[in-house]
Amino acid sequence: MSRILVEDDNATPFHSMEIISSSLTLGQLLKNVSDVRKVEVGDETPVHEFFDRDGSSLDGDNDHLMRPVPFVLSFNNLTYNVSVRRKLDFHDLVPWRRTSFSKTKTLLDNISGETRDGEILAVLGASGSGKSTLIDALANRIAKGSLKGTVTLNGEALQSRMLKVISAYVMQDDLLFPMLTVEETLMFAAEFRLPRSLPKSKKKLRVQALIDQLGIRNAAKTIIGDEGHRGISGGERRRVSIGIDIIHDPIVLFLDEPTSGLDSTSAFMVVKVLKRIAESGSIIIMSIHQPSHRVLSLLDRLIFLSRGHTVFSGSPASLPSFFAGFGNPIPENENQTEFALDLIRELEGSAGGTRGLVEFNKKWQEMKKQSNPQTLTPPASPNPNLTLKEAISASISRGKLVSGGGGGSSVINHGGGTLAVPAFANPFWIEIKTLTRRSILNSRRQPELLGMRLATVIVTGFILATVFWRLDNSPKGVQERLGFFAFAMSTMFYTCADALPVFLQERYIFMRETAYNAYRRSSYVLSHAIVTFPSLIFLSLAFAVTTFWAVGLEGGLMGFLFYCLIILASFWSGSSFVTFLSGVVPHVMLGYTIVVAILAYFLLFSGFFINRDRIPQYWIWFHYLSLVKYPYEAVLQNEFSDPTECFVRGVQLFDNSPLGELTYGMKLRLLDSVSRSIGMRISSSTCLTTGADVLKQQGVTQLSKWNCLLITVGFGFLFRILFYLCLLLGSKNKRR
């Protein structure tokens, strides 16, 4: 038992009492108290009581306001079929005997059931039985039109937008930011999901209460951790994942295998937490692989599936009588679910499959209905004609479903009435601020990532500076400058490839958070760009300072500043391009392969290896799409734009030809002969090639260096927009 001390705004104790586990929801506390201080007198996780500001408990005349609002979730005849590719055989090669190359596979076949608030419904079965598919169907994560059947809450069909607000879905994998502490992780979830109108102190209060409810107080200040950083345990990670999705105290909670990969003790602790959440007034529906005896004692309803069919549906207590009636009684002192799953696997491997068990379950369900005609209906409420809209509103008034907000709302017609459903808890700029702060905090605790990238850029710049040290104004110097610029500009893009795994690592976090409107996709895209940009500035300055003066580039201070700008623009467009690809490709290795290949094509068509005028017409479009082309042409113009600078004088005319091996005297005589032949006096000091001539020879004549800079920056914005469209169209998080 724990003792909760409730205080007023002046921190003066005004009421103190011991709290029992049957008290009301945590959400109620947010509206009615200012602070909560826990004094441990045991190891039981505290549950909070509901108090008025004057310190008295709300009872008596107001008791009907606090009476639990009943919810019953029912699903009937859920059927889900998918088309799968069929293996080709010899007959498919014969035109007149060719059949369809796909066949229909049934993942769910007329699945029905129901559960209510305060209960845990567990879906069991072997791998491939349809557990996760059923959870996805109930959570509206299957595309509309693909799923047949109905899902209702209190007898009324659930609209997609309504379900988003009143429910939460916990994925099987614990995808969390590794360098955030448990407390920070839950606090960011509170900032995303709880309304802006709720003071930050109340949000902190909600987080602290949730930490106690999840039983992770000792790990509150510990980072989540990953392979390279020691953090919390697997069971604690799972409870944090659950906490993120129940921060707003949802009415319905879906979980996909919450005990997967955990030892028996950790699994029991997780389900024990779920039981507390259910007792606070939530409906818990989860899939589970093979629960232990202790876990089974916490479950209220079970559904066993076998290849999409229901083979058992009922309470755990009815398992022995069910299998005894089927002719396979469960031995004493044996785990009932293990016995049931072993029997189902054995039947699946037999000739008749589980058809007999499916039919027996149907008869057994009919016998139950005949012996007990009372269906699962809500108990009497203050208003027996309470609609779903009114029930949800009443639940919100009790403190359940702490969400809503200032970010705009949509009105849903439901059951003859309307209910304002908030689209987002926060306005656009608050989302950007919070997302940016979270990313910076997570990245700041991993300085080695920026350090390694900065070291790579500096080392690359140092190698280039020493290889192309102090280039002179000669024909060879011109060719070496061209090689330096081509390699340097392509390096800007290749070093951006490390941005690829960033979003791929965050993909499922992003999908989980946006699935329930934690924030807008546009907010994420802008925040991602804001967090990325400062590091690009450091990288640009590091490379520019390392190479500009060492290589001996022209232009002075203004030339250096433009050199910095075009490098920054190259980093920006390269980072945006790789970020866009990260929203398209599903795997890191595939992404790296695509990035390397496309950047190689960009370099090929940049104009360094082959001039624009010599590129075949059917490939010229790739030249204009090349990201390397524009920064390459910009630095060429920055270097060769001075009309007084000469790069080929007199006898240097022969340097890039076999005649370059001749002695200086022979070159002078040859130059004199050339002068007489063309009728023009050419001395050893005559300028034959200026910077403008070099640009013309390279085909750099269409755009100014500032236009090239703007186009490079524009490419960066274009790929950010394309990244947003990928997130908008490709992250619906639904099966088809």
Curated annotation (Swiss-Prot):
Location of the ABC transmembrane type-2 domain: 430-640
Boundaries of every ABC transporter domain copy: 88-332
Residues given in the record as ATP binding sites: G125, A126, S127, G128, S129, G130, K131, S132
Location of the protein in the cell: Membrane
GO terms for biological process, alphabetical: pollen wall assembly
Topology versus the membrane: Multi-pass membrane protein
One Pfam family this sequence matches: ABC2_membrane
Membrane-crossing segments per the record: 410-430, 449-469, 484-504, 525-545, 569-589, 590-610, 709-729
Keywords, ordered alphabetically: ATP-binding, Membrane, Nucleotide-binding, Transmembrane, Transmembrane helix, Transport
PROSITE patterns associated with the record: ABC_TRANSPORTER_1 (PS00211), ABC_TRANSPORTER_2 (PS50893)
Source organism superkingdom: Eukaryota
Listed GO MF terms: ABC-type transporter activity; ATP binding; ATP hydrolysis activity
Main location as per UniProt: membrane
GO cellular component term, pick one: membrane
InterPro entries hit by this protein: AAA+_ATPase (IPR003593), ABC2_TM (IPR013525), ABC_transporter-like_ATP-bd (IPR003439), ABC_transporter-like_CS (IPR017871), ABCG_transporters (IPR050352), P-loop_NTPase (IPR027417)
Family: Belongs to the ABC transporter superfamily. ABCG family. Eye pigment precursor importer (TC 3.A.1.204) subfamily.
Protein name (Swiss-Prot/TrEMBL): ABC transporter G family member 16
Organism: Arabidopsis thaliana (Mouse-ear cress)
Gene name of the record: ABCG16
